[in-house]
Amino acid sequence: MENRMNELVSLLNQYAKEYYTQDNPTVSDSQYDQLYRELVELEKQHPENILPNSPTHRVGGLVLEGFEKYQHEYPLYSLQDAFSKEELIAFDKRVKAEFPTAAYMAELKIDGLSVSLTYVNGVLQVGATRGDGNIGENITENLKRVHDIPLHLDQSLDITVRGECYLPKESFEAINIEKRANGEQEFANPRNAAAGTLRQLNTGIVAKRKLATFLYQEASPTQKETQDDVLKELESYGFSVNHHRLISSSMEKIWDFIQTIEKDRVSLPYDIDGIVIKVNSLAMQEELGFTVKAPRWAIAYKFPAEEKEAEILSVDWTVGRTGVVTPTANLTPVQLAGTTVSRATLHNVDYIAEKDIRIGDTVVVYKAGDIIPAVLNVVMSKRNQQEVMLIPKLCPSCGSELVHFEGEVALRCINPLCPNQIKERLAHFASRDAMNITGFGPSLVEKLFDAHLIADVADIYRLSIENLLTLDGIKEKSATKIYHAIQSSKENSAEKLLFGLGIRHVGSKASRLLLEEFGNLRQLSQASQESIASIDGLGGVIAKSLHTFFEKEEVDKLLEELTSYNVNFNYLGKRVSTDAQLSGLTVVLTGKLEKMTRNEAKEKLQNLGAKVTGSVSKKTDLIVAGSDAGSKLTKAQDLGITIQDEDWLLNL
């Protein structure tokens, strides 16, 4: 019986791959169903022999209560975007300055959802969403229902891989036909449908919707030398990889590839929104490293956005958490990139003046980055005697006089007690990338603020269940959940708190770098501008902004209040002792290492307290140079930086 079960699992997985991945089935649906029913029956009789890669694991039936947060072992970075050939040429120049012979891998940018898959001993252990790059959601049960994701690898590997989960166009059309027949609201586009499906709590619905994946990265350390090798290895493990790709050292040839794909993309069975260009050599990738936000060795070219004409009916002016006043146009509704658009940003007053935008104008609307609707320009041939737009002199929230600082493009309200600014700051503090207080969205903030229950972020921690129950629409169950979410947020690692404070220029990635360095929010608040500016990837602008923020008396009072409510100020991620051998030193790895991998060398340096960066500068303390070291070694010699070899590192 056990042999027959093994045989059936092998056959059914092969037939499923032919059907879902290769679009080339070799057996009929009825033949597949017959074998599948046989396996189900055998598994009922012999549950002790059920294999981890059995296709029966993909069948629905589970109704999940929710999704738990998942800390990624290997962070998922965003990519720098490019919208023109000139930006790609500039990227090429930056790379070639370090590596004149660098070749690139150009791959399709699938319009889906990034997922991370972790296998332990070859068995799928965790499938998670990207989230903010550091913390995603555990959606393992849903990803088990995606038919081209292997539940079990042929080898007993411990590996984490990355890819894009998407909905093929054919599956998208079938879902919307069914929704139409049932009188339900249709999905706007395949990406929204894929996102909605992966958020389903009923795994049976996920199993029916025929999601698919393309894998593109091994996040865990690999012995492979190039991105091309990685893709071939992923395919050998049974993952789906995309074969529309090109390797070339010529950006002109990459551009020709982009133009060809853009012209033909409508014929692809899935949506794409651009081309990702990566340095093909993994060793070069390591040397180039990362900025605070993105890898220096990759760029995402985005196809030109779809454009439509619409009429501006009116303009709303709103003030954000930093006091910037943003104009938003109300439009005649148009269909754009799969959604109905009736509002679009006008950016700022300088943009309105530059484009001479007026109410009543017919304008060209597009989605910036395929996400945010924006006005591109005015169709002057359709203008009729519209008057120049009146720019507000007073804040739309508090009535204070607005200012337009020299060198800035935006109007700004500088009243610290402006109600809308306060509400926006409170909502930001509770948002997912900050303190992540579930249920504490803008509408709740509005109710609490209007009821005079909160006026600053410390007030959030004064709230009781009884306070929440005084609000319209809040029942005991909701109030209890929100209260517990507030209490749980006290235990967040301090970089979440720092980002939540909404300091100008200090994003989530910079917050993490700062807390990794200083370990504690109080220590950071007392740090000098020079010590902050010396952190690789940050600089003087962030240092000055932090110094200005922390020297305010009201900020010191706020930190005291947060301390009294037991809000955690410590960084909970991995840090190295200040007594470590290389503590505080900035080190660059360059050249080919013979006795250890680059990842092993990097990990050893970090464990010894060093900060490993990708570029040589005056801030670099030493470099470890292997064979064939290039421009980085030359630059280090010119700057008089200490140079060590691989043996020196091995002997530490």
Swiss-Prot record:
Residues involved in NAD(+) binding: D29, S30, Q31, Y32, D33, S78, L79, E107, R130, E164, K278, K302
GO CC annotations, alphabetized: cytosol
Protein family per UniProt: Belongs to the NAD-dependent DNA ligase family. LigA subfamily.
Residue span, BRCT domain: 577-652
Residues the record lists as binding Zn(2+): C395, C398, C413, C418
Protein name: DNA ligase
HAMAP family associated with the record: DNA_ligase_A (MF_01588)
UniProt GO BP: DNA repair; DNA replication
Species assigned in the record: Streptococcus agalactiae serotype Ia (strain ATCC 27591 / A909 / CDC SS700)
EC assignment: 6.5.1.2
Catalytic activity: NAD(+) + (deoxyribonucleotide)n-3'-hydroxyl + 5'-phospho-(deoxyribonucleotide)m = (deoxyribonucleotide)n+m + AMP + beta-nicotinamide D-nucleotide
Cofactor (UniProt): Mg(2+); Mn(2+)
Keywords: DNA damage, DNA repair, DNA replication, Ligase, Magnesium, Manganese, Metal-binding, NAD, Zinc
InterPro entries in the cross-refs: BRCT_dom (IPR001357), BRCT_dom_sf (IPR036420), DisA/LigA_HHH (IPR041663), DNA_ligase (IPR001679), DNA_ligase_AS (IPR018239), DNA_ligase_CS (IPR033136), DNAligase_adenylation (IPR013839), DNAligase_N (IPR013840)
Active site feature: K109 (n6-amp-lysine intermediate)
Record SUPFAM superfamilies: BRCT domain, DNA ligase/mRNA capping enzyme, catalytic domain, Nucleic acid-binding proteins, RuvA domain 2-like
Pfam families, per database record: BRCT, DNA_ligase_aden, DNA_ligase_OB, DNA_ligase_ZBD, HHH_2, HHH_5, Nlig-Ia
Function: DNA ligase that catalyzes the formation of phosphodiester linkages between 5'-phosphoryl and 3'-hydroxyl groups in double-stranded DNA using NAD as a coenzyme and as the energy source for the reaction. It is essential for DNA replication and repair of damaged DNA.
PROSITE patterns given in the database record: BRCT, DNA_LIGASE_N1, DNA_LIGASE_N2
Molecular function terms, GO-annotated: DNA binding; DNA ligase (NAD+) activity; metal ion binding
